[in-house]
């Protein structure tokens, strides 16, 4: 594929941006077109609630949008989408298919890979998960002293942690009757020590989530958990009742002491950051129940169908992707804020920090050339309204343009005080996107200061600080209620957005070689931390840091 910057559609957009972008004023666009909201929004009726994508507060008009869609077509987005759903090996550097969509293929249509339908295997694992969940949640599965399981501890990292953690937090209202759930990921001993302090070994079930069963952080934490467990249980055979594995490495699982019957399989065509739909989601299913887990899958499948079948100009993931391309490659934006106005979604931005930055944080194209354009953004965010009292100042009046996605449910899970809390939350959500779009003109600020009784001197002094330029772009994503189905659809929408951007940038969104170098060096450094002798095998900074650690580690501090 030719470089993006040499693409005729890209060049057309670049010329248009140079000539006209200064004239794109959101206030004026809304004044000129009273129907702008209707022209630049999608209302997706999932039959399990609505998802409204309002992208009218973006720095685009119909002409720009048309050119962006042409860019997507010229970069082969439609063919690439079809190739992914068809099981072709689009992860070129690892020679793998990318089939997380098969994990939630609720239509159960055949999905062929290397001439074989993957669906029978997918359904077999789902059936095994369902049966296991029913046994644990009903109390039929007993620990070594005959007690039912009260606590699930998921030990994993990256994709084996972030997805299940985010979803179990988001779906807490649906967890009635299920065990409590804990997540241990960090190799920092504090994480597992503080978690184990809350647990009773007689009623704890550990899920060890590692595809290879060799991930250093995960296996170290798992061994620590097993050691803690055996201090109480004594008998190694009791491990089989309290440890299960999500892995593909049967030998390592057996070696650990886990019965292979309690190993839940997934496949190399499931990328870590797309794996919550697989056996990696076992902690979700145990916590909220398998029926709710199936609804999560169904919501994602609904969005898969929308992505597959809807024309690009009415396609929610495609539109989100193209708006991101517009800001990154034409306005020079470097970050993207995800701002969910729902406390249950407090890990949503962190989840897509991995989803986006590990997928599209690449500077090499599929053919091995270095890009001469920007690729994946820095993704960050916190729940509203907390963020309003923290970092929104920079979004409103800082020197950087930060495109934002605002997300909110119309209905709350907790309509306390007759819905007062949620009404205030909704009002703040609506006010922020309007304020970022409209800003406050010098004339409006002057009138406000005059009405507040400021003297002419005070007014002139304060006036520049009270002006908001506005014209800050946002998407509003409003959905009926945060249910398992709607959450599944929202996650899939962002997954496909990331995929589309990767295709336009001509990068492989499904490998993560950048994770490897640090891991390799850590293995070399670890033995060098033993003993007191000076280390000289690295650069002076790394040598100096190792020396400082060796000097300080035995220092007594009160």
Swiss-Prot record:
Compartment annotation: Cytoplasm; Secreted
Positions carrying N6-succinyllysine: 454
Main subcellular location of this protein, as a coarse class: cytoplasm
Classification via CDD domains: SIS_PGI_1 (cd05015), SIS_PGI_2 (cd05016)
Residues annotated with N-acetylalanine modification: 2
Post-translational modification: Phosphorylation at Ser-185 by CK2 has been shown to decrease enzymatic activity and may contribute to secretion by a non-classical secretory pathway.
Catalysed conversion reaction: alpha-D-glucose 6-phosphate = beta-D-fructose 6-phosphate
Top enzyme class: isomerase
Pfam family, one: PGI
Residues recorded as bearing N6-malonyllysine in the entry: 454
Pathway assigned to this chain's UniProt record: Carbohydrate degradation; glycolysis; D-glyceraldehyde 3-phosphate and glycerone phosphate from D-glucose: step 2/4
Keyword entries, A-Z: Acetylation, Cytokine, Cytoplasm, Gluconeogenesis, Glycolysis, Growth factor, Isomerase, Phosphoprotein, Secreted, Ubl conjugation
Disulfide bond residue pairs: none
Keyword Acetylation part of the UniProt annotation: yes
Record protein name field: Glucose-6-phosphate isomerase
Organism: Rattus norvegicus (Rat)
Gene (UniProt): Gpi
